[in-house]
Amino acid sequence: MENLNTKDEKVMNGKFEDEKYSFDDLMNIIRRLRAKDGCPWDREQTHESLKQCLIEEAYEVIEAINNQDYRNLCEELGDVLLQVVMHAAIAEEGKEFTIEDVIGGECKKMINRHPHVFGNLEVKDSQTVLSNWEEIKQKEKKYENISDSILNIPKALPANIRAEKVQKKAAKAGLEFESYDQVLGKVYEELEELKEARKIGQKSYVEEEFGDLMFSIVNLSRFLHVNAENSLTNATNKFINRFVGVESFARQEGKHLWEMSASEIDTLWGRVK
């Protein structure tokens, strides 16, 4: 590497004792790892190969937040930052863009989307801020209609989150149920259609109707003002805790769950519930 100052040289040569590091240091470390005489694994990575890593690191951040483990949160945020820097380094090598482009683009976006802070626009509350944000985003992306906005919601999002985003945008365009009762009625309607599909027995039809039921349940969550993704996560965690409790009681009795009858397991389930 050329044009390195003394600190850069120490970082690039792995001399880490008692150093305070900066963002530039991290960028230089990744460049060193991806150099010809760097790390074979790091050199092999591409935008494509790192996709799963980015997803996993993001979920580990969420896990730390959910656990209120802020020491671990610091570490996990660093891992997410590492992913950003890795992608920027790969792009830099391919002359696609640089980390400066990433940072500069985000700075411009934040300034442009906060005219009430960096301009003269006056706002009443946070809801107005969100409305302005969406309007500015529409102009930036050159969306001509709501359909353009919906079509650009990432397909890689978790299904519950994507469904909710689609429903919210459709609601802003006027495609919305008028009441909770209407939404609940739609859930029951989709459930009946699923029952009919099951009677027919065609797997693709069952899957389609099950998807419709799930979509309507996400819609119901909006009217209940609860987060569908969080609700399902909490329900899953509750089931896991109860299962662990049931198995613990079974072991105390010197038994394995697979050796027990359904009624015996149900009795233990009632104890932990």
Language model feature labels by segment:
Residues 1-76, 82-210, 214-273:
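Flexible "arm" and connector segments at domain edges
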